[in-house]
Design a protein with these regions (language model features):
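Active-site-proximal, glycine-rich beta->alpha crossover segments in alpha/beta enzymes
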Residues: 129
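N-terminal signal peptide c-region/cleavage motif recognized by signal peptidases
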Residues: 19-24
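N-terminal export leaders
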Residues: 3-10
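Bacterial N-terminal signal peptides
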Residues: 10-18
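N-terminal secretory/targeting leader peptides
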Residues: 5, 25-125, 134-136, 140-311
Length: 311
């Protein structure tokens, strides 16, 4: 009897294992790729990249592995050229992305709206734009331009840093070499302020800061801390909140069409959920009254200048 019971148990266990293996090795639906490529400017040490990781993980979990996403930080799918990212999404070189409205503005001029100086004075203003009617209209424009937008994220307010001196007025910027992103609006803004702006990709920015080829840059504080910009001479930060940098979660249209309606719904909701989490991460330490992130940065030996509304 013991032998018979043992055999029954062994056969049952083998059958369960085989069933589990068959389920794990179930073929993908027709038209699905084994892996989808997600483009990001920065890696998962940054709130932006963390948003990509959260989105990918949620999608994999909720689709039970039918949709597997690999992250490609550093805009590596387009050799680091941030301004080519949207075109590559439209062409199918990139399957998915979380991209900056700034980087995509050369192809979608309406996205320059978000780069107008001092348009969004606080987080409530950002939310009013992105989560309201304007945000819906922007999504329609992005859709018409060739990619399917699903959710909003956020890089943050772009504050200016430099290796020379505290900046309190345009006079302090005169002649200063500032790295800016590849949008003509940023060139015009910093030229008008008297600086000497230089466009370059993020991949080139840190070596340029380290060598002194440029004096400063402008980016959210989460970028400053994650990239440890205080180690490349950036010892002065001016909090002026002149431009906020929303992010958009998108999918290539052909890729989207290849998925079942059920999986489309999963990917969309995962993007929305990831976007909310990513925004919370990007604002952490800055939306509290005492701004603890600024205290952490000051403790690194960085001089922080906070401009008054009049300034």
């Amino acid at each position: 009897m013991q032998v018979r019971s043992f055999l029954k148990f062994t056969l049952a266990a083998t059958a369960l294992a085989a069933a589990g293996l068959a389920q794990a090795q179930a073929p993908l639906p027709a038209g699905y790729k084994a892996e989808y490529k997600m483009s990001l400017v920065v890696g998962t040490a940054f709130p932006w990249g963390k948003g990509g990781e959260i989105w990918a993980n949620l999608v994999k979990e909720r689709t039970q592995g039918r949709i597997n996403i690999k992250l490609y930080p550093g805009v590596s799918l387009v050799q680091g050229d941030q301004t080519r990212e949207f075109t590559a999404i439209r062409q199918g070189v990139i399957d998915m992305a979380i991209g900056s409205t700034i980087n995509w503005s050369p192809q979608i001029k309406e996205l320059n709206l978000f780069s107008l100086p001092f348009l969004m004075p606080d987080y409530k203003a950002i939310d009013a734009l992105t989560q309201g009617e304007v945000g819906k209209q922007i999504f329609q424009i992005v859709d018409k331009a060739g990619a399917l937008p699903l959710a909003w994220g956020e890089n943050g307010y772009r504050e200016i840093t430099n290796s020379k001196k505290p900046i309190k007025s345009p006079e302090d910027l005169k002649g200063m070499k500032i790295r800016v992103v590849g949008s003509p609006l940023f060139l015009d803004t910093f030229t008008a302020l008297g600086a000497n702006p230089t466009q370059m990709s993020w991949a080139d920015a840190q070596p340029a800061l380290s060598s002194g080829a440029v004096d400063g840059q402008e980016n959210p504080m989460s970028i400053f801390t994650a990239a440890k910009l205080h180690t490349v001479g950036q010892k002065n930060v001016t909090m002026w909140g002149y431009v906020a940098d929303p992010l958009i979660f998108v999918v290539n249209k052909d890729v989207w069409a290849s998925w079942t309606p059920a999986d489309q719904a999963i990917v969309r909701q995962a993007a929305i959920d990831a976007g909310k989490q990513q925004i919370a991460i990007a604002r952490k330490g800055l939306d509290e009254a005492d701004k603890p992130l600024l205290k952490e940065i000051a403790a690194l030996g960085v001089t922080i200048t906070q401009l008054s509304p009049a300034e």
